[in-house]
């Protein structure tokens, strides 16, 4: 009995074709007869052959990995960078992004390499990694409006796709949501419930998504005769939602409906309202944004504006794959539509 790994020759014998044909199928070369491809794939399954990724990369000139970069604009202190990484892993939104990307890449035998770019040194490391060809391109989730990484990647002409429209215009592809429409959906639902004193907990207002959600919310309320909407800015965390809701109650103690710009902050809003003896939704209706797992486990379960994060992330990966295959195309922008999901909080 031999422990030797199956080779291309073994697959060729099993399939009854030449070694060159097997190589073309394994390396994804086009214009191979579909019937021959099926024969080869069946032979691969029977023999247990595993393609050598290094050898395949020599043929395809692709690393078959992509850099998944979570970037910000913080300082270089160890404490700041550790906190940045911890926040990313604690946010269910990021987990959904990873799930969508992996769901696209895995069937294509491609893999993400997770990188964090909070400091200038981190950003330089990302640029070097890509310039060396160790990844085919970058999928960037930026967490700060002042993040310089998108502009650096565009200037270096490195294949890149962003999750969400950047705060500053750069010639890069991105996927995003119609956040303004999402804000309108939240406002219209609160009004339909009979809320007459609505307020909002926004995300960081230096981010385009936060500003757009607020604009849509305000527009819908203004059309219904509510020109002034009390607001408090949060930071997309439970604690920031608690603090923002406390400020709102100090400004508008008779508030009867709250739109929080993500589910984590909505959870914080619900917690603070309970502490103040306010019932949700009987006294104050609460709407979140994202439809993350938090929306289903919150007490009460959150009515929320669904953002199809997994689909958006998969499209992000598809755009990058297409960009690499075509060896450069003009920027593509894909906009997804939000959807209101009604549960118990509003």
At which residue positions do the language-model features occur?
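Alpha-helical recognition/docking segments in bacterial nutrient-uptake
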Residues: 1-3, 65-188, 250
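Short gly/ser/thr-rich secondary-structure transition/capping motifs
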Residues: 46-52, 119-123, 270
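N-terminal helix-turn-helix DNA-binding module of bacterial transcription factors
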Residues: 1-65, 69, 346
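Generic structural signal for helix capping and beta-alpha/helix-loop junctions
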Residues: 29, 61, 76, 122, ...
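Bacterial carbohydrate/catabolite-sensing allosteric modules
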Residues: 1-2, 10, 14, 46, ...
């Amino acid at each position: 009995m031999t422990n030797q790994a199956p080779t291309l020759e073994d697959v060729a014998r099993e399939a009854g074709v030449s070694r060159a044909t097997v190589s073309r199928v394994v390396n994804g070369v086009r214009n191979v007869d579909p019937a021959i491809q099926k024969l080869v794939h069946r032979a691969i399954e029977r023999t247990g052959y595993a393609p050598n990724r290094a050898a395949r990369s020599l043929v395809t000139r692709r690393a078959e990995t992509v850099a998944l970069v979570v970037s910000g604009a913080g300082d270089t202190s160890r404490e700041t960078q550790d906190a940045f990484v911890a926040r990313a892993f604690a946010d269910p939104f990021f987990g959904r992004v990873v799930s969508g990307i992996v769901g696209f890449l895995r069937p294509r035998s491609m893999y993400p390499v997770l990188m964090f770019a909070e400091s200038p040194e981190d950003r330089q490391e990302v640029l070097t990694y890509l310039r060396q060809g160790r990844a085919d391109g970058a999928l960037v989730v930026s967490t700060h409006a002042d993040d310089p990484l998108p502009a650096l990647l565009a200037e270096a002409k490195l294949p890149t796709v962003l999750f969400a429209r950047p705060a500053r215009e750069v010639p890069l592809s991105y996927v995003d949501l119609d956040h303004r429409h999402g804000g309108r959906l939240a406002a219209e639902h609160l009004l339909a419930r009979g809320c007459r004193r609505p307020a909002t907990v926004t995300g960081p207002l230096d981010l385009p998504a936060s500003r757009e959600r607020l604009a849509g919310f305000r527009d819908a309320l203004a059309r219904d005769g509510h020109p002034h909407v009390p607001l408090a800015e949060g930071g997309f965390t439970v604690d920031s939602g608690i603090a923002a809701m406390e400020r709102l109650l100090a400004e508008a103690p008779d508030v009867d409906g709250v739109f929080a710009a993500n589910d984590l902050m909505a959870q914080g809003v619900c917690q603070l309202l309970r502490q103040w003896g306010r019932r949700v939704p009987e006294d104050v209706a609460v709407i979140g944004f994202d439809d993350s797992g938090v929306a289903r486990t919150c007490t009460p379960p959150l009515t929320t504006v669904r953002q199809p994060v997994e689909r958006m992330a998969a499209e992000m990966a598809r755009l990058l794959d297409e960009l690499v295959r075509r060896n450069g195309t003009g920027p593509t922008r894909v906009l997804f539509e939000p959807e209101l999901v009604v549960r118990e909080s509003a």
